[in-house]
Amino acid sequence: MGFQIAIDGPAASGKSTVARLLAEKLGFDHLNTGATYRAVAVYLHEKGLSPSSAEEEIENALKNLKIDYVNGRVYINGKDYTEKIQSPEAGVLASNFARLEVVRRHLVRIQREICDDKNIVVEGRDIGTVVLPNAHLKIFLTASLEARVERKLKEYQKRGLKVTKEEVERELISRDEQDSKRNVAPLKPAEDAVIIDTTSMSVEEVLDRILKLVRERMNT
């Protein structure tokens, strides 16, 4: 088995930036599981399905699903979904579908297959608790709601999306509520995770902290 690093945390806590840069510095593969959930949610929505659809219908839609995550782009059955999953609506769809056991079961299996025997940095909301419970290092990133709203607002503005600060705050509060209170794989730190509050930390400071932990684990 390769060296696996799990990075969990709520939306806009810094997971994606830190995970991507950490993987680059270490020469590891990188998997953004949130992107796979958003892509599958959009895929199911395009097929006319919703979280309230019959489980059998969703099961059939997912049965022969093939997901590839290559250089930060996510493909479903060979079709690039990367641009489609960037909107706030895709994030809401993902949170709603992620509550379903049938969706999580299929995606956890696929995510584990992607990670198998790799040196890899994996980011998400249930990596250390469900997807990779035996990861060599588990990190849980957190930050104040105010800091996360500012980060997400800048991200949307950079993409040219017109959203207000109030809309972003409502989105994050709603996603936090759904992620932490869902019955299946709720968002929470693994018991052996290192919790890092990134509110007042720069990306470089967070990376330095995690790299130090990686070196310690690799040398034990």
Curated annotation (Swiss-Prot):
Main localisation, per the record?
cytoplasm
E.C. designation(s): 2.7.4.25
Protein name (Swiss-Prot/TrEMBL): Cytidylate kinase
Q: Name one GO cellular component term.
A: cytosol
Q: Which NCBIfam families match?
A: cmk (TIGR00017)
Q: Which terms under GO biological process does the entry name?
A: nucleobase-containing small molecule interconversion; pyrimidine nucleotide metabolic process
Q: What Pfam families does the record point to?
A: Cytidylate_kin
Q: Name one GO molecular function term.
A: CMP kinase activity
Q: Where does ATP bind?
A: G9, P10, A11, A12, S13, G14, K15, S16, T17
Would the keyword ATP-binding turn up in this protein's UniProt record? yes
What's the catalysed reaction? CMP + ATP = CDP + ADP; dCMP + ATP = dCDP + ADP
Record organism: Thermotoga sp. (strain RQ2)
Q: Where does it localize? A: Cytoplasm
The protein's UniProt keywords, in alphabetical order, are: ATP-binding, Cytoplasm, Kinase, Nucleotide-binding, Transferase
- Gene (UniProt): cmk
Q: Which family does it belong to?
A: Belongs to the cytidylate kinase family. Type 1 subfamily.
